[in-house]
């Protein structure tokens, strides 16, 4: 009878500990952008799946791979969602302590072309128009220029490419009328 009591008491004690905030491992995640591509993560946060796995997830948005990489290097984040460009730049500069990319999160780039006007979009519509691009050398900008070239356009000649707006301010700049597309 005593072994059953001890076992029952132990189970009750363990059950009382489940879900306790005191035992959660804090993980600081810095995402490059708040994106529809990370929707499964946002659902998991809202549904409490991380807590059920013993993780207290602290989510911040870096608004650019350069800032997200800086958060990792400075110790302000434990893990990051971003493209590989920051790692490549660090490695090419000869940094001994460069970042390591270890997983592919999405199958494709998260680029969208947004127009000021409702139209049946064709890539040729961009010719001669002002377009807010990304940071030179950043993954979104490199992908955008690649796609333009695949559609027979020269990004430096065929469009008026704006690349001097900080990532966090691009949507505000577009809404305020700074470009025809973003």
Enumerate the language-model features and the residues they cover.
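C-terminal motif of bacterial Sec signal peptides marking the signal peptidase cleavage site
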Residues: 12-16
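Short, conserved catalytic or interaction motifs in soluble domains
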Residues: 19
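Short, glycine-/small- and polar/acidic-enriched structural segments
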Residues: 22-176, 180-181
